[in-house]
Amino acid sequence: MASQPPPPPKPWESRRIPGAGPGPGSGPGPTYQSADLGPTLLTRPGQPTLTRVPPPILPRPSQQTGSNNVNTFRPAYSSFSSGYGAYGNSFYGSYSPYSYGYNGLGFNRLRVDDLPPSRFVQQAEESSRGAFQSIESIVHAFASVSMMMDATFSAVYNSFRAVLDVANHFSRLKIHFTKVFSAFALVRTIRYLYRRLQWMMGLRRGSENEDLWAESEGTVACLSAEDQATNSAKSWPIFLFFAVILGGPYLIWKLLSTHNDEVTDNTNWASGEDDHVVARAEYDFVAVSDEEISFRAGDMLNLALKEQQPKVRGWLLASLDGQTTGLIPANYVKILGKRRGRKTIESSTMLKQQQSFTNPTLIKGVTTTNPLDEQEAAFESVFVETNKVSSAPDSTGKNGDKQDL
């Protein structure tokens, strides 16, 4: 009887560990290994290695603003295109003094490829935003007054022209009637005889030539008086025009210079001169544009106060070296607290010294209070929205983790 072939291996026999020999009492045999068991499964026991994954970055400022909000102070003035041709007439023509438009002032600073602007361009626009908004409001106010005066002037002017048209029609009617009556020789003869009769009876003195000379003298006197009044009335618009031309640029320059001084004072928080907020970087961040700054985990950053923070969701205005400012993701740093600036400390020290010199007896009983808690409470509202959208639980600061600086 022929021997039967050996049965196929069982599942538990095919999942032997590589290198293990056959069971005791059995001869050498093949070693089976499963396909799903690789050499990497056998690791040495020990502490597992954990890597901190940085939280996701919220949309960048250039993606949030886009091309709709970058022109907040670059509107296109195209509202002045009015003409008053409806009030005109065939005899004097229509009056349309204002027909213009400022369509060249509105443009988009983003290029076609939607690259974010440089840090210099953004800083220049942010520094001049308030000044241009003030100028824009002034321009709109003058534009509204100009449109009102334009409408009033057009209404008065066209009413005056309508009255002149009526007077002109009456004068034409008089001329036509005069021509009709003067066409008759009989009327002229009767008129001549009537005047001669008046001269003969003494009812009319002088001759006809003297009457004509007297009438011409009165006409010349009236014309000279009207010319003097016209020349005097034409002088004040010239002075007003030059006042606007010279005074407008001066006012704009004063507004820009004043706003630039305020912007320079508002950037002292980066160097620590003014009050600022201190934060510690929890993750590494690499900037992808000039409006951002790079930092590494463990770096100490100075953050701007709540009033100076840009209205960008999930991003904060910060400085690493005290000179360069840029945006950083809010969920990559941990807020430590608010620190008083050097100017504030010096001014408070000088004030205390002056008070101690002037009234030393009252200073002994005064208990000094630490304003750090109040300052921190005022600044917590800046990061409320950031803490909600942050995915990492340790990426934002809590009240218990803040340190007194």
UniProtKB/Swiss-Prot annotation:
Region (Disordered): 1-71
Name the record gives this protein: Peroxisomal membrane protein PEX13
Sequence segments annotated as region (Targeting to peroxisomes): 147-235
Positions of the SH3 domain: 274-338
Biased composition, class Polar residues, residue ranges: 61-71
Gene Ontology biological process terms, A to Z: cellular response to reactive oxygen species; cerebral cortex cell migration; fatty acid alpha-oxidation; locomotory behavior; microtubule-based peroxisome localization; neuron migration; protein import into peroxisome matrix, docking; protein import into peroxisome matrix, translocation
Residues on Cytoplasmic side: 158-176, 257-405
Entry keywords, A to Z: Membrane, Peroxisome, Phosphoprotein, Protein transport, SH3 domain, Translocation, Transmembrane, Transmembrane helix, Transport
PANTHER family xrefs: PEROXISOMAL MEMBRANE PROTEIN PEX13
Protein location: Peroxisome membrane
InterPro entries: Peroxin-13_N, Pex13, SH3-like_dom_sf, SH3_domain
GO molecular function annotation: peroxisome targeting sequence binding; protein transmembrane transporter activity
GO cellular component: peroxisomal membrane; peroxisome
Region (Interaction with PEX19): 177-198
Peroxisomal matrix side: 1-136, 195-235
Transmembrane segments: 137-157, 177-194, 236-256
Primary location recorded for the protein, binned into one broad class: membrane
Topology term for the membrane: Multi-pass membrane protein
Functional note: Component of the PEX13-PEX14 docking complex, a translocon channel that specifically mediates the import of peroxisomal cargo proteins bound to PEX5 receptor. The PEX13-PEX14 docking complex forms a large import pore which can be opened to a diameter of about 9 nm. Mechanistically, PEX5 receptor along with cargo proteins associates with the PEX14 subunit of the PEX13-PEX14 docking complex in the cytosol, leading to the insertion of the receptor into the organelle membrane with the concomitant translocation of the cargo into the peroxisome matrix.
Phosphoserine PTM positions: S356
Native species: Mus musculus (Mouse)
Family the UniProt entry places it in: Belongs to the peroxin-13 family.
